[in-house]
Structure formats: C-alpha cells, structure tokens
Design a protein with these regions (language model features):
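Acidic/aromatic-lined carbohydrate-recognition and catalytic surfaces
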Residues: 2-221
Length: 222
C-alpha cells in the first residue's frame, strides 16, 4: 500500500471539482467515476487531487458560497453507492435521458436525486438494523459541535422556500431559544433527514479518501 504525500514533499497533482466528473446524474459525485479518477491519478504518477470546497452550495451553485464549513454537499452523494446498501434499487436510480450531458446540470441533478434521497431516508428509518442505527447515532454524536445547528438551518431553509435567513420569522432569525426549540420539535423528521444526508456523505467521503490514500493520492480542499 502506498502512503499519501505530505505537504513537505514536492509533488504534482490535478485540480478538479468532483461535480466536473462525468456521470449519468447531471453532475459528478463521490461514486464510481471518482474512484476511477483516483485510479487515473495513481497510474499517472500524480500525488494530489485538489478538489476545491465540497460543502453545500447555495444560489449560483458556487462551492465558495456555502452555508457551512463542516457539512458536505448532498448533491455529491452517489446513488449507486446508496443502492449497494439496499436503501434504493437499481431500477429507481436509473437516470432519465438528458442528465448525462457534457455540462453540469445542478438544478436538474438535485431535482432527480432529492426524492430518491428522501426515499432512502424513509427506508433507513423503518428498516435499518441495530448496527446501522448505532453507526448513525455515533456519527451524530461525533458531529455534535456543528450537525444539529446545520441540520436545523437546512431544514428551515427548505421550509422557507429557500429564502435568506434574514427573511425568516423574527424568532428564528434572531435565534430565540424558544423559537429554535419549537422549530426543532415541529420539524424533527426534516432535521433528521438532513442529518442522515451528512451521515451518508461522511461514509462516502471516508471511503473515497481511504481508496485515494491507499494508492498514494492525497486529497486537498481549497
């Protein structure tokens, strides 16, 4: 097994945001094509993959306009990897015609992925075994310094039609404790859905990083 490079050693690499990878779902993701790109880098004696930010995106689809420095972009979730876990079927993730074009289609990609991610969440909530539930709870505990606030923010952003937080109800935008607690309770399932997305992202990210490091390729953000 090769060792990943260190910043103290001179090495070359390639800059490529994962959404620029080819794929059938409108944008690249952390699935098969990302692994293939890692293999290509290793075979080409490249030691670094500079990925730019992989945080959630907002209006304009810029990775530099993220609502969180800790969360991952759910758009980068690989449906193929989720299907391998049994939460989706191959038939369900079959992409519609037109998504696999030469240019990224962020809105169309999310419009296709989001309902499937919600379906995966519903199945996980109903059918996950004890080991999977413990893994989810362990992730939530390990990310307790940022995940609860991020998941609540993401849930409220969607429930407010994507409006800026400054246009939300006064209690929420001023972070009134009672208002936040009430929102967290009223929208518990939606908050948990966003926690679940980050759980999936963490798993897929770690798997890709392990593969890359095993081939002597390091991952750099920006």
């Amino acid at each position: 097994m090769n060792k990943p490079p260190t910043l103290e050693t001179r090495a070359s690499g390639v800059l490529l945001h994962p959404t620029s990878l080819p794929g059938p779902y409108g944008t690249g993701d952390l699935g098969p094509t990302a692994r293939e790109f890692v293999d290509f880098l290793a075979a080409s004696a490249q030691r670094w993959w500079q990925m730019l930010p992989v945080a959630p995106i907002g209006p304009g689809d810029s990775p530099y306009a993220a609502p969180s420095a800790f969360a991952g972009n759910p758009l980068l979730l690989s449906l193929e990897e989720i299907a391998k876990s049994g939460l989706l079927t191959k038939r369900e993730i079959k992409p519609p015609r037109g998504l696999a074009a030469g240019r990224a289609k962020f809105s169309a990609a999310w419009a296709f992925k989001e309902p499937l991610l919600r379906k995966a969440f519903e199945r996980f909530s109903k059918d996950a075994n004890e080991a999977e539930r413990q893994a989810f709870d362990g992730f939530r505990a390990g990310a307790a310094c940022w995940l609860p606030d991020y998941a609540l923010f993401a849930a409220l952003k969607g429930l407010n039609g994507g409006k800026a937080w400054s246009d939300w109800d006064r209690g929420l935008r001023l972070r009134n404790r009672a208002a936040l607690a009430g929102a967290r309770e009223a929208h518990a399932d939606e908050v948990r859905f966003h926690e679940f997305l980050q759980f999936l992202f963490d798993r897929q990210w770690r798997a890709l990083r392990t593969r890359a490091n095993g081939k002597g390729v390091g991952l750099i953000g920006d």
